[in-house]
Curated annotation (Swiss-Prot):
Protein name per Swiss-Prot or TrEMBL: Isocitrate dehydrogenase kinase/phosphatase
UniProt keyword annotations, A-Z: ATP-binding, Cytoplasm, Glyoxylate bypass, Hydrolase, Kinase, Nucleotide-binding, Protein phosphatase, Serine/threonine-protein kinase, Transferase, Tricarboxylic acid cycle
Localisation: Cytoplasm
Family: Belongs to the AceK family.
EC number: 2.7.11.5, 3.1.3.-
GO molecular function, one term: [isocitrate dehydrogenase (NADP+)] kinase activity
GO BP annotations listed: glucose metabolic process; glyoxylate cycle; tricarboxylic acid cycle
Keyword Transferase: yes
UniProt-annotated catalytic positions: D383
Lineage, uppermost ranks: Bacteria, Pseudomonadati, Pseudomonadota, Betaproteobacteria, Burkholderiales
Source domain of life: Bacteria
Native organism: Burkholderia vietnamiensis (strain G4 / LMG 22486) (Burkholderia cepacia (strain R1808))
């Protein structure tokens, strides 16, 4: 601080700081209550209730910020508080956080409230938390001993099998397990398959996070195995095999598999964390290299993730010298996309005007992005970070990019000193555009990319998402090889679409016409017409028809729509189904033919 006050004399400053913290505490109490409710809904198998809960939790933070801002404006005339008082508000707030269990999240909440009240010229060290003020190192839960951040187990005492069984039963899930002894046998077999002979060191132990991670129809046990100098991550998803009966579905023992389930293309977990920083630190030990911003986001604290990401960006800018450039690939009609080559993200801005045939508005596009934020993304739609008033140094912007910005989004630009301030943008993980991946790839790459593309669209379809624009350029390939959709301006709910077959041509003139001879409503979709846009490359066509010949059959799309209208929620797995115990160790399940969510026979046949 430029002028640290010798005395904190402002009673209003203290009252405002206390009010802001009370609203944050209310927010975090609701956040934790949602995770507790998730356990109850999971135990009941109430999947629609879990979806509703996840949607409501996403909007809860902004609702608390709005309530806090309104109170501060009504009772304290916050917009007209002078600088000295704002400085004291922050210092009082820091004092209130000294024994807090979520100080980093509380600081972010403070920033959110301030940014609604103050002009951005006040976004400096004196008034908001540009850097954290309270350390989260060694922060631990002061709740009863039964609820530490993680529990330690020592298999050397009772043996590994008994320890694994105790790990599962300690979560006290209400429904019974179909055959927990069988499931633990599968876990033991998977460990043996992965690591072979396992020589236990004197410090051999297993650490397990104390709360389950809920998402979709799974509850994940997350932990790590410590053996000498090795730290081995694991995740055990537990699922309902039928109503009211549970089973361990698999155990994931590779770091890359955990990185996928915590990926930016999945919805946020519901997890009860007394000390979120301790959970994030634990997860960093099993996924080293994964940014803390992404981990905070994946556990449902997306505002904290957004805050950390922006700090990461500023830090990267101060330690790099390359320039922002227009993103490679085909330019979009709706979004201007640019990137910093040394930073693995893209920046997307809605253009001021859209050429035909696009018929949409900025507000409609922003609502589409909100739809994706609220929806279950299933590992097939990229999460986005939304920012306002982003200041980038002009010296770091390529001249061609500046010209493009001034041409396409002049209404969103403001020059301020040596910075260009962009009023609104989205930031996403950078991926390889699927069209470039297929264009430049080997035969094996094409096989993988096309198979993944078809799987992605079919999974989105089952999740009630119609992408709208199916072109390959609107999909990307992640570093883990998954195909993910990222162009949302034409996205619709499949249940809002009319799936139609192309009517037979009435005559030869119709047949030769380059235009439809039939009426097309605003929500009509014609799967039979997608072929010319997707199958132009002979290599792609061969692979596509091998794996996804049914893609162009309206019956496939209509069947998914019908199931959705009947309230059916399909099963999704953020890992290859070949890893599921009922598939991988099918012989162990011969005595339980009803296992596997009612789809076991199909999975095993596959």
């Amino acid at each position: 601080m430029n002028h640290f006050p010798k005395l904190l004399s402002s009673q209003i400053g203290f009252d405002i700081a206390q009010t802001m913290l009370e609203y944050f505490d209310r927010h975090y109490r609701i956040f934790r209550e949602a995770a507790v409710e998730a356990k109850t809904l999971y135990e009941r198998g109430d999947w629609h209730g879990l979806q509703r809960l996840a949607r409501e939790r996403i909007t809860s933070y902004d609702e608390r910020v709005k309530e806090c801002v309104e109170l501060l404006e009504d009772e304290y005339d916050a917009e007209n508080i002078d600088d000295e008082v704002w400085q004291q508000i922050k210092l009082h707030y820091i004092g209130l956080l000294t024994s807090h269990r979520q100080p980093e999240c509380a600081e972010t909440f403070f920033n959110s409230v301030c940014c609604k009240i103050l002009h951005r010229s006040y976004f400096n060290n004196d008034f908001i938390f540009v850097r954290p003020a309270i350390s989260t190192e060694y922060l631990e839960n002061d709740e009863p001993a039964a609820k530490p951040t993680y529990r330690a187990y020592y298999p050397g005492t009772d043996g590994l099998a008994a320890t694994l069984e105790r790990i599962v039963t300690n979560f006290q899930l209400e429904p019974p397990f179909e055959d927990l002894t069988r499931d633990i046998g599968c876990v033991m077999q998977a460990i043996d398959d992965e690591f072979g002979q396992f020589d236990a060191a004197p410090d051999f132990q297993i650490h397990v996070l104390s709360s389950l991670f809920f998402r979709n129809k799974s509850a994940y046990i997350i932990g790590r195995i410590i053996n000498a100098d090795r730290v081995l991550p694991f995740a055990m998803p537990i699922r309902h095999v039928r109503a009211g009966v549970l089973a361990v579905d698999t155990v994931l023992l590779r770091r890359e598999l955990l990185q996928v389930i915590f990926s930016f293309s999945h919805s946020y977990f519901l997890v009860d964390m007394g000390v979120p920083s301790a959970y994030v630190d634990f997860l960093c030990t099993i996924m080293p290299g994964k940014p803390k911003a992404e981990i905070y986001t994946s556990v449902g604290l997306q505002k904290q993730g957004k805050n950390l990401f922006y700090r990461d960006l500023l830090h990267h800018l101060s330690h790099s010298s390359d320039r922002f450039i227009i993103a490679p690939g085909i330019k979009g009609l709706v979004m201007l996309v640019f990137t910093l080559p040394s930073f693995p993200y893209v920046f997307k801005i809605i253009k001021d005007h859209f050429p035909p045939p696009k018929e949409t508005t900025r507000a409609q596009i922003m609502e589409k992005y909100q739809l994706v934020k609220r929806h279950d993304r299933l590992g097939r739609m990229a999460d986005t970070l939304e920012y306002s008033s982003v200041a980038l140094p002009l010296s770091r912007l390529d001249h061609a990019l500046v010209r493009e910005l001034e041409k396409e989004v002049p209404s969103l630009l403001e020059h301020e000193d040596d910075n260009l301030v962009i009023e609104h943008l989205y930031i996403e993980r950078r991926m390889t555009p699927l069209n470039l991946y297929l264009q430049n790839g080997s035969d094996a790459d094409i096989e993988h990319g096309v198979k993944e593309y078809g799987n992605a669209v079919k999974e989105l379809m089952k999740a009630n998402i119609f992408p709208g624009d199916m072109l390959y350029k609107n999909f990307g390939v992640t570093r883990h090889g998954r195909v993910v959709f990222y162009d949302y301006d034409e996205i619709e709910y499949l249940t809002d679409c009319n799936v139609r077959r192309v009517p037979a041509p009435r005559n030869e003139e119709d047949e030769l016409s380059g235009e439809p001879w039939y009426t097309v409503g605003p929500h009509d979709i014609f799967p039979e017409t997608y072929g010319p846009f997707l199958l132009g490359d002979p290599r792609v066509r061969t692979v596509f028809m091998k794996h996804h010949a049914d893609f162009f059959d309206p019956a496939l799309w209509q069947a998914s729509k019908d199931k959705l209208l009947q309230g059916e929620l399909p099963d999704f797995y953020p890992y290859d189904t070949s890893l599921r115990f009922c598939v991988r160790y099918a012989a162990r399940f011969d005595a339980t033919p009803d296992h596997d969510d009612g789809a076991g026979a199909a999975q095993r046949a596959a």
